[in-house]
Amino acid sequence: TLHMEERVGFVGVVNEDLSQAARVNQVVGQFQDMVTGRIGVPDHERGMAVIGLLVRGDSARVGAFTGRLGNIPGVQVKSALAKSNTTSNERKQDI
């Protein structure tokens, strides 16, 4: 089978419907083994929240995670992953 490379990155979540917060937290909990850091900033005045997640996992699994979050009404998701998991020392050795 094809081995998927583990990568690091972030997932940004904008929840414009705080009534969906429990669903967002449920999905994050289902993928908690990938989440290495989390910050959540609620804005009760506007009825929204922004969540930043640091993640580590293969691109297919991160895609499944962001897809599940993005399917929640009122939730927008963007993500970025490092192109590879090689360290700067490993890259220097290749030169």
State the predicted function of each range.
Residues 2-95:
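Long, contiguous binding/interaction regions
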